[in-house]
Amino acid sequence: MLAKLVQLPRDLLELVYPAVCLICAKSPTSPRTHLLCEKCLEAMAAQPMPSSTVLAETSPPTSLDAVHAGWPFDDAMQALIHAFKYRRRPSLSRILGALLAQRLYKHLAREIQQAILVPVPLHRRRGRERGFNQSQLLAQTLAEAWKMKILPRALERTRFTQQQATLTAAERQKNVEGAFASTEKSNLPNQTIFLVDDVFTTGATMNACAAALKTAGATQVIGIVLARA
């Protein structure tokens, strides 16, 4: 899929994309991505995946049944996700989403045949500030790669919440409790949902989203994330 990324004129690329890799900040970027160097791309592909976690039988029980992550949340992934979200590099969704699709396919091949993709939503205010929803962009790339149905607005944030990164585990859970609601009740009963986000830390956000999806009738909610902290 990386080979299918749109090729832009070189002079325009030099204006839009960095001359050096977003991870190492040293090597020239690869012509395949224009954002990462070949060495860092190869390192990402070779890195072991975090073990998939089944959450349905944990204590206390969670609404999220399992979570699958492409990478650990190390320095390299932190740099990429920071650039993606805060340095406004939405084009990273195509690269990271394609790599994630390749890494997770064999672990989810059976579920992919029947599941529906749903991104974790941003509040309208934060969406205006950022200009895009990183989870929705990732979900769209996964939908193309896996030929899956996506419901980009199946969930909404019912209230503005503080950014989770600044909070403790207990504060994160309280911050997002009851903050999500389903807008697609007719399409969710008896469905398996792939819930897409960028990072899984304590799971508070994804669990709150999963609770809303199950209230709307979903039978299984599986988290799909770039990285797990």
What residues fall within each predicted segment?
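Glycine-rich phosphate/pyrophosphate-handling loop used in enzymes and phosphotransfer proteins
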Residues: 1-229
